[in-house]
A protein has these predicted regions:
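C-terminal target-recognition/interaction regions appended to catalytic cores
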Residues: 1-155
Length: 155
């Protein structure tokens, strides 16, 4: 895998010779959700914007679901990965309008700063829970550095 669009962040999480990329399997989506994803990601819309052109795709409970379909944007910081991403995956719609899907476990793990060679085990639901419950590794590293500086501070 060669990515010519590497940046400092991807260089940190993608080690040299990391090999096969695991946990990058798309979950199944129903036909209505696929159509929602297609329209939302193509236009950068929110669910309420569909009312104008595809009222049949508005959820049966629009008040409860008004912010449940969120397209992540390439140029903006990603939304916080939630502990219940396994249930609320529609908050993480992939920004590529040709893909019509939500984030894979690997993509959610990348947002959390897990290196690409870190492998999650168990069912896919369990993998999403592991990612959502985790302290992001780069955050943990920075916190540990601060604690080390305080604990071992010269008196």
């Amino acid at each position: 895998f060669i990515n010519r669009n590497s940046n400092e962040y991807t260089k940190k999480i993608r080690r040299k010779n990391y090999g096969k990329l695991f946990n990058h399997v798309v979950r199944n989506h129903n036909d209505d959700d696929i159509q929602r994803f297609r329209h939302l990601s193509a236009k950068g819309w929110e669910l309420r914007d569909l009312q104008k052109i595809r009222p049949d795709l508005i959820h049966h409970d629009p008040q409860h679901f008004k912010n449940r379909y969120t397209v992540q944007q390439w140029k903006n910081p990603a939304k916080t990965i939630l502990s219940h991403i396994h249930k609320d995956g529609n908050l993480f719609i992939h920004p590529d309008p040709k893909q019509h899907r939500t984030f894979t476990v690997r993509e959610a793990a990348r947002v959390q700063s897990f290196p690409d060679d870190f492998r999650f085990c168990g069912s896919r639901t369990s993998q999403y829970i592991q990612v959502g419950n985790a302290v992001p590794p780069l955050l943990a590293y920075e916190i540990a550095k601060c604690i080390k500086n305080v604990v071992f501070k010269k008196k």
